[in-house]
From Swiss-Prot:
Family: Belongs to the autoinducer synthase family.
Protein's organism: Ralstonia nicotianae (strain ATCC BAA-1114 / GMI1000) (Ralstonia solanacearum)
GO biological process terms held by the UniProt record: quorum sensing; signal transduction
Record flagged with keyword rRNA-binding: no
Protein name according to UniProt: Acyl-homoserine-lactone synthase
Keywords, ordered alphabetically: Autoinducer synthesis, Quorum sensing, S-adenosyl-L-methionine, Transferase
Gene: solI
């Protein structure tokens, strides 16, 4: 798995199409999400903007095998606009340059689906790239909505992940707003050197 970062303007057309198709495969095809802006092949929404930061993973054949979307909470973002009821009662959605939203996170590989393979085989390196990318942009915490099972996986890896609100059932599965602390413990668990803020390669 090799990860690429894009955070400067619109995605290149070929990358945009490949990423939207991968997201449709994962979030619509596999997870069965009912997303109003998804068509028969591609998944995009109003948060895919010029200021959106993308982390994209490719396998040895160049095919996309992971993705993540990072949004500054100082601009409109998914949790604040759509999922604010998932936060603790009376707690406003964060608006801070030190907090970024993580959404559309996915990671898979042929090896990770092999019998006996650990489920974090693909998640850990993908999340490491996401955390490092966000930290480079001033983030000290990430927030997002995810499955409760994913929070447990993050914790097993050693990431400082904790609930930002109550568990709710959406689409038949328990989901929760989740904080990820970008601290020494999380960086150590993900194999990120403490002072490592070296930008990754740009998407081509």
């Amino acid at each position: 798995m090799q990860t690429f970062i894009h955070g400067g303007g619109r995605l290149p057309e070929a990358v945009d199409a490949a990423l939207a198709h991968y997201r449709h495969q994962i979030f619509v095809g596999q997870l069965g999400w009912q997303l109003p802006m998804a068509d028969g092949r591609f998944e995009r929404d109003q948060y895919d903007r010029d200021d959106t930061v993308y982390v994209v993973a490719r396998d040895a054949d160049g095919a996309i095998c992971g993705c993540a979307r990072l949004l500054p909470t100082t601009r409109p973002y998914l949790l604040k606009d759509v999922f604010a009821p998932l936060l603790m009662r009376g707690v406003p959605a964060p608006e801070s340059p030190g907090v970024w939203e993580l959404s559309r996170f996915a990671a898979r590989s042929g090896a990770s689906r092999a019998r006996g393979a650990r489920p974090d085989w693909a998640v850990r390196p993908m999340l490491a790239s996401v955390v490092q990318c966000a930290a480079q942009r001033g983030a000290r915490r990430l927030i997002g909505v995810t499955f409760v099972s994913m929070v447990r996986l993050f914790r097993r890896i050693g990431v400082r992940a904790h609930h930002a609100g109550p568990v709710r059932c959406i689409g038949g599965r328990p989901v929760v707003a989740c904080w990820i602390d970008i601290d020494a413990s999380t960086c150590a668990a993900l194999g990120i050197p403490g002072a490592s803020v070296v930008p990754g390669p740009a998407l081509q």
